[in-house]
Structure formats: C-alpha cells, structure tokens
A protein has these predicted regions:
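Tubulin/FtsZ superfamily GTPase core signature
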Residues: 2-263
C-alpha cells in the first residue's frame, strides 16, 4: 500500500532527524568549556551577585567567604565557607593573614568546588581581609589542579585610605604568583573613564560592572558562537602563564562600529 509505505518513509526521516539533533546537542555539550567564576570575600561576592543579576551566561558561580551571613545572602549556586573553625563564621576582620589561614583550613572544600573546571576566574576586591588573603590560596589550589586560572581584582579608591591600598598591593603581588593571568582594575581610574560621575553611592557598583565586563568578554569568546571563532585551546595558549594582562572595553554604533569600538 502506497500510503502505508509513505507513512513509514516519513516516520524514518523524522526518527533520523531526532537522532541527528540529539547527536548535535551532545556534540555541543562536549564542546562547551566549563568556566567557573569565584567571588572571594565581600567585594568578590558582590561582583558575583552583580553578574548573576545581569544574567551572565555560560559560566557557573561560586562564592567563598569567611562571613557566614554574607555568604547566606549571596546568589551563587555554590557557596564555600572559609575557615569555619578559625573565624566561627564572623569574617576576617579586615586582616589578610586571617583570610589566608581561613582559606588554607578549607583547601579540601575549595578543591571540591573547583573540580571539573577547565577555566576559573577569581574575582576579589583587594585591600580587605578575606579577598586579599584568601584569593591567592584559592588560585594556588586551582593552578595545582591544572585549571587555567585568571584573576580579575580591583584596587581601592583613594578615599579608602593608604593602609588599604598597601594591603591591596601586597595581596596582588601574592595573587600574581599563583594565577596564569591577572587583570588589575584600579578603581580610582574609573573616575577618569566613566561617563557618569562616580560618587560614594555608585562607586562600588561601577567597579562591579567592570569586573563583570572582564569575565563576560573572555568567557563569551569561548562559549558563545560569534564571527570571531576562538575555542578554549586558543584562549589557553594566550593566557597560560601570561602574568599581568590588560583589558579594554569599547562600544560604538553605525558604520565602522567595530573599528570605532576598538579605538
């Protein structure tokens, strides 16, 4: 019967289409690079919250903190309390040494959270206790696991004081020893380049936005299909053991927008 054969023929085509679609989905899943963004301390946690709120795609979020209350309020899907025995969940008290010891106490928990990653971004506000002291330890654990490790951190605004700046610079030096690439964003420069006036109220929001742009621009190159076709191997070859890195963000519209944005 012609009608029966026709129905069988189209059923076979539909089945082959479903199998092909399933194979393509599996291939895409295999090609997706597992990227995790780790917010360490209060500043890093705030940056992660901003990224989650902005709907950043293609990455997994982890918050790490000594402060139990701050951690409970964080929007990250994975949370790691650092140094629960040392700090009893009360934070590092703006002391980087306590932040470092807390992270060292929790190395196993850090490693478990990072497993399966091919690339991690470690974000923190330098100059405080947990971010400054713990971020280098987190980076060391990631690097020892063979994960491509990129730090994106901020230096304090001038109004935060010389002591905090000194702690930040020491923390950055420690972090540099354990990451493949390190992007340092001096918050004070945001006043010079921002299109809106930087005030005490919006200063840290502006810094969080720059941190988000840094993570988004690199992760999108790997996991978001685009005209510029870069895979993880390309990014790894550029960023592996690169030391200090620099980031530029530009935008433009209309004719010649790509060239104008680059300028």
């Amino acid at each position: 019967d012609i009608s029966v054969r026709s129905a069988q023929f189209y059923d076979k085509i539909r089945m082959e289409d479903k199998v092909m679609a399933l194979m393509l989905d599996e291939e895409m899943d295999e090609n997706v690079t597992t990227i995790k963004v780790i917010g360490v301390g209060g500043g890093g946690g705030n940056a992660v919250n901003r990224m989650v709120s902005d709907g950043l795609q293609g990455v997994e979020f982890i918050a790490m903190n000594t402060d139990q209350q701050a951690l409970a309020k964080n929007h990250a899907t994975v949370k790691v309390q650092l140094g629960s025995k040392l700090t009893k969940g009360r934070g590092a008290g703006a002391d980087p040494e306590i932040g470092q010891r807390a992270a060292e106490e929790s190395k196993d928990e850090i490693a478990n959270a990072l497993k399966g990653s091919q690339m991690v971004f470690i974000t923190a506000g330098m100059g405080g206790g947990t971010g400054t002291g713990a971020a280098p330890v987190v980076a060391e654990v990631a690097h020892d696991l063979g994960i491509l490790t990129v730090g994106i951190v901020t230096k304090p605004f001038s109004f935060e004081g010389k002591r905090k700046m000194g702690l930040a610079e020491q923390g950055i030096a420690n972090l540099l020893m354990h990451v493949d690439s390190l992007i340092v964003i001096p918050n004070e420069r945001l006043k010079m380049i921002s299109q809106e006036k930087i005030t005490l109220m919006n200063a840290f929001q502006a810094a969080d936005n720059v941190l988000r742009q840094g993570v988004e621009s690199i992760s999108a190159l790997i996991n978001v299909p685009a005209f510029i076709n870069l895979d993880f191997a390309d990014v790894r070859s550029i960023m592996k053991d690169a030391g200090y890195a620099h980031m530029g963000v530009g935008s433009a519209k209309g004719a010649g927008k790509a060239e104008n944005a680059a300028k």
